[in-house]
Amino acid sequence: MSFQYHQTLDVKGAKCPMPLVKSRKTVNSLPVGNVLQVIATDRGSVADFQGWTKTAKNVELVGQETIQNNGQALYVHYVKRTA
């Protein structure tokens, strides 16, 4: 699946809660309507991003996917700034 995005944040190797902490800071610096692609290796980030975007008032989770890269799972999240 392919998603359009405006900026990429690489948080590979970071453990909870750092992928969310860094993503919040980065997405808040984007213009409204832009999408941030976040690439993580922490499997727990899938549920973390779902929970965060359900409760946050200024972001929307527009997609998630898991891809394999040299035998390693990468969890990719697409977060849109809405306000």
Map each language-model feature to its residues.
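An N-terminal amphipathic alpha-helical segment
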Residues: 2-32
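Short glycine-rich, basic-tinged beta-strand/loop micro-motifs
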Residues: 28-42
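Short phosphate-engaging motifs
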Residues: 45
